[in-house]
């Protein structure tokens, strides 16, 4: 809801649209449908699955989700409630399938944070990390890892700055220091800075693709840490 409000404020003349806020555990009625929100874990804050009870049967829409017992934001996926809904009987499952064909288990974001800290600690110069602007958990992990290594952080990309501003207002950036401005960036030693920017999927309007690094030059030695895998249809 905070991101919706921020986006509307950034669009001159945008109509005021009423927004009803609900959270995990809530149930509400829309016409013939009863909808229950179930807590799940993902890279964005406050993700939920929706159990939609219809006259014909129960539909479970997972939204984006993963099993992470140690998330950096929010609570773990409510596996107990999902089992209960499964026992109730699900007519249709609409499920996020990203990386479903890959074998193995997705690492916890807490494990990723530890790896990031190790990479940043060993880097001889600047470190640049690309991620989705919506991935508040990863942005927080990178920022805290940078702080632990005595580095300051520069955000690049309008959507990322907007997301982080909202996340800070809502308390998701607790413990994260203020970020550098591009004006101050040039005065910070190369081994004392980390850049977080959009463009991990090759999006044409992202900070990386629009040559944002012309203003923030990465000369050798530096480390590029592009974490997200390519997602079909993302660019």
Regions found by a protein language model. Give the residues of each.
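Short beta-strand segments
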Residues: 196-198
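His/Asp/Glu-rich metal-coordinating catalytic cores
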Residues: 1-191, 200-219, 235
